[in-house]
Regions:
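Rhodanese-like catalytic fold shared by cysteine-dependent sulfurtransferases
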Residues: 2-5, 12-40, 49-82, 91-127
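Short, surface-exposed ligand- or partner-binding patches at beta-edge/loop junctions that are enriched
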Residues: 86
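Structural scaffold elements adjacent to functional motifs in cytosolic proteins
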Residues: 42-44
């Protein structure tokens, strides 16, 4: 009976460990504080059309849905800076964060994406 209980608890521990993210997430306030600092690159992982409509000032755009996303990111992003990642609602940026974290980047995801950012009346640009 003890062995069965130990096996069950071990499996629960493994599934919990596998579900952990390899990146941080933050809300709009934390994201704003992060990108105001130095050693941060802001990355918008939406499509080019979405980026052209509105984005955070100074953001780079690499579409996470492109097959060569990781290769583009490795060619464009510094490994010695934090990458602050966002998309429309947070789902694509979470996917991008997983991919980038697996490549050794330090990444932070904006919970709620640019929608949350704009709901908080934070600045965007179309330039």
């Amino acid at each position: 009976m003890k062995k069965i209980l130990i096996c069950i608890l071990s499996l629960l521990g493994l599934t919990t460990a596998c579900g952990q993210k390899g990146f941080e997430e933050t809300d709009v306030k934390g994201f704003a504080e992060l990108i105001a600092g130095e050693n941060v690159v802001v990355l918008d992982v939406r499509t080019a059309a979405e980026f052209d409509e509105a984005h955070l000032a100074g953001a780079l755009n690499i579409d996470v849905k492109q097959g060569d996303f990781v290769e583009q990111a490795k060619a464009s992003l510094p490994t010695d800076k934090t990458i602050a990642v966002y998309c429309r609602s947070g789902r694509r940026s979470a996917s991008a964060c997983e991919k980038l974290a697996a490549e050794g980047f330090r990444v932070v995801n904006l919970k709620g994406g640019i929608l949350a950012w704009m709901d908080a009346e934070m600045p965007t640009t179309a330039e």
